[in-house]
């Protein structure tokens, strides 16, 4: 399903649970429109939105279908985060970037959460970890062993320090996959087959 559409449906049938995307491929969308959609969603759910974003890239055909050069995806996500935050927080807002430019525009309604909803960065690559440290309010990990998890947190800390940011209030989350089978090996084979197909990677031992 399209994640933000699904979260809008959940907003109407829940009252307390936080609603988040894990993760939204921001490079495939126009960030000014995304700012409006997510601001509306945060209003509908009463300030419960967590906006999880990522680069993706496992399936280049997604980018081809959207007319987005695959090699630009990281740069588009980094800039898109700044675009979304600018429109969430400023009225009027102006932005001059590589992919997006506007002068004296605004969106309404603004998000309920102030100064803006949290943005969590998903990914395992060094580029994703650096982005989380520079721009994120949190990090979403997935399919990572404890040693690599600890190393990743240190990379995030160093990136934040280089950007002159503190990590007070920074949140770490983990995307967990659960597979049920008659025994461990059966469940594991099903998990590896499903995840390898979904992410176009080999998740085998």
Describe the function of each predicted region.
Residues 1-205:
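Active-site-adjacent structural elements that line small-molecule/cofactor binding pockets in enzymes
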């Amino acid at each position: 399903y399209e994640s933000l559409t699904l979260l809008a449906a959940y907003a109407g049938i829940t009252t307390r649970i936080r609603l988040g995307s894990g993760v939204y491929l921001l490079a495939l969308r126009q960030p000014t429109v995304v700012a409006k959609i997510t601001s509306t969603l945060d209003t509908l759910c009463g300030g419960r939105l967590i906006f999880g974003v990522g680069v993706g890239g496992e399936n280049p055909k997604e980018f081809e279908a959207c007319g987005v050069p695959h090699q630009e995806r990281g740069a588009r996500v980094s800039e898109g985060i700044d675009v979304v935050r600018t429109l969430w927080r400023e009225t009027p807002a102006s932005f001059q970037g590589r992919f997006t430019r506007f002068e004296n525009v605004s969106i309404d309604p603004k998000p309920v959460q102030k100064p803006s909803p949290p943005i969590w960065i998903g990914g395992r690559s060094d580029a994703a970890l650096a982005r989380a440290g520079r721009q994120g309010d949190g990090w979403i990990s997935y399919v990572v062993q404890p040693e690599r998890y600890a190393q990743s947190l240190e990379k995030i800390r160093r990136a934040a320090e280089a950007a002159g940011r503190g990590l007070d209030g920074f949140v770490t989350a983990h995307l967990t996959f659960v597979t049920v089978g008659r025994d461990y090996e059966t469940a594991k084979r099903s998990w590896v087959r499903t995840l390898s197909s979904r992410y176009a990677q080999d998740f085998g031992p």
